[in-house]
């Protein structure tokens, strides 16, 4: 596996980083959730992600929204990406732990940067009738998050 770098760099003294590589989650849903939580305070983002996991709050889908129904609130189309939200919640907790290790207070921080990049494709084959086989590939995602102190 190649070394993955962060797509942006912020002030190292006032920020903390976390990265998840080759996660088995949807790239499209990851993009929409990254867009939804960027700029939130860490407490609000943690509560939002927990609400998504228990299907209480929907994530607005701006790009990948064909044949999606409307949801409650100010959004038009939305979904409940539970698997992506649980992985993003782990990433947020990791970033908060890194902030505590650096001597920062995670209660006074916000999500300054989130990004997703497609990871490698895990190739697989599914046996079919009459000796044939069909490809069954698994997409992976690399997530990154940087939290920074509120100025």
From Swiss-Prot:
Highest rank taxon of the organism: Archaea
Matches recorded under SUPFAM superfamilies: Ribosomal protein L22
This protein's record includes keyword Transcription regulation: no
Record has Acetylation as a keyword: no
GO biological process, one term: cytoplasmic translation
Keywords: Ribonucleoprotein, Ribosomal protein, RNA-binding, rRNA-binding
GO cellular component: cytosolic large ribosomal subunit
Pfam families given in the database record: Ribosomal_L22 (PF00237)
GO molecular function: rRNA binding; structural constituent of ribosome
Subunit structure: Part of the 50S ribosomal subunit.
Role, per record: This protein binds specifically to 23S rRNA. It makes multiple contacts with different domains of the 23S rRNA in the assembled 50S subunit and ribosome.
Family annotation (PANTHER family): 60S RIBOSOMAL PROTEIN L17
Family designation: Belongs to the universal ribosomal protein uL22 family.
Protein name: Large ribosomal subunit protein uL22
Organism of derivation: Methanococcoides burtonii (strain DSM 6242 / NBRC 107633 / OCM 468 / ACE-M)
Protein encoded by which gene: rpl22
């Amino acid at each position: 596996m190649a070394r993955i770098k962060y797509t942006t760099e912020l002030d190292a003294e006032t920020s903390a980083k976390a990265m998840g590589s080759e996660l088995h989650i949807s790239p499209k849903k990851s993009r929409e959730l990254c867009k939804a939580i960027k700029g939130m305070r860490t407490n609000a983002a943690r509560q939002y992600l927990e609400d998504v996991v228990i299907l209480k709050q929907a994530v607005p889908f701006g790009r990948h929204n064909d044949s999606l129904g409307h949801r409650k609130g100010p959004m038009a189309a939305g979904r409940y990406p539970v698997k992506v939200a649980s992985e993003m919640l782990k990433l947020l907790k990791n970033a908060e732990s890194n902030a505590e290790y650096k001597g920062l207070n995670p209660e006074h921080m916000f999500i300054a940067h989130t990004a997703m990049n497609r990871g490698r494709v895990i190739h697989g084959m599914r046996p079919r009738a009459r000796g044939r086989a069909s490809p069954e590939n698994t997409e992976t995602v690399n997530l990154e998050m940087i939290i920074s102190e509120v100025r």
